[in-house]
UniProtKB/Swiss-Prot annotation:
NCBIfam families assigned: iron-sulfur cluster assembly accessory protein, PRK13623.1
Cofactor: iron-sulfur cluster
One family name in Pfam for this protein: Fe-S_biosyn
Positions of iron-sulfur cluster binding: C49, C113, C115
Organism: Acidovorax sp. (strain JS42)
Subunit structure: Homodimer.
Protein name: Putative iron-sulfur cluster insertion protein ErpA
Family note: Belongs to the HesB/IscA family.
Biological process annotations from GO: iron-sulfur cluster assembly
GO molecular function: 2 iron, 2 sulfur cluster binding; 4 iron, 4 sulfur cluster binding; iron ion binding
Keyword Zinc-finger recorded: no
Bound cofactor: record note: Binds 1 iron-sulfur cluster per subunit.
The keyword Iron is annotated on this UniProt entry: yes
Keywords: Iron, Iron-sulfur, Metal-binding
Amino acid sequence: MSAVAENTTTEMPAPILFTDSAAAKVAELIAEEGNPDLKLRVFVQGGGCSGFQYGFTFDEITNEDDTTMTKNGVSLLIDAMSYQYLVGAEIDYKEDLQGAQFVIKNPNAASTCGCGSSFSVEDH
């Protein structure tokens, strides 16, 4: 009797969705800076009216505890502490009547403030 192994591996969805729109805007900003080594770092820190707030910055260095995602040639970095608050989130870039901005849709946020830049999580 012989057995044939089949590859039943399915691709898991990314734990964080980095949209095409966000990747395109980041690529544009990196091109303006003239430094192709830049990556977008997304982080969560204490503050804001709801307890936590999102932050965005460019970084050339990938730290040991960073999770790295790449979309359309653009790298996104998230540190381990921030990652736990961002699992399942969507990072997008929107342009509308209120202006242009990066937007995070976060299913882990129990509540958000009116401006959308800070959030709270439920106690476990």
